[in-house]
Amino acid sequence: HRGARGLPQLRDAVDLMDGGAESPQETRTRLLLIAAEFPRPETQIVVCDEFGNFIGRVDMGYREWKVAIEYDGPQHWDGPEAHARTIERIADLEAQGWIVIRLSRDILRYRRSTSLARVRDAMRDRGWSDHAKARLDASLPL
């Protein structure tokens, strides 16, 4: 109701919500991209080939520019089979013309600006016209 304390902050928080994240780190990655002035990424993008065959699903990204952002948590390295599946899935996505940017907790923590620059450069190379406004110094508590 009118005059309720915290209502503007609540509206901002609701606007940032996205049910597609499968981990807190995926959420933090998405929020970092938004804080860095990138377009809001789509989450859990299903990628199919030209015949409609399922290729894979990416954590988040930009379908328009075929730029995928993958957060690699420990499950991606949980044994040789998981590792092989991850490598194969990335190769299949790249064969469909996607640029895949892989991030991890340590990369986001210690090389945040480099990570954001990779996303910016990939999107610029694919035609994103607002690349100059990307803030590589954006931060969130990661």
Task: Tell me what each language-model feature is.
Residues 1-142:
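Surface segments flanking catalytic/ligand-binding clefts of nucleic-acid enzymes
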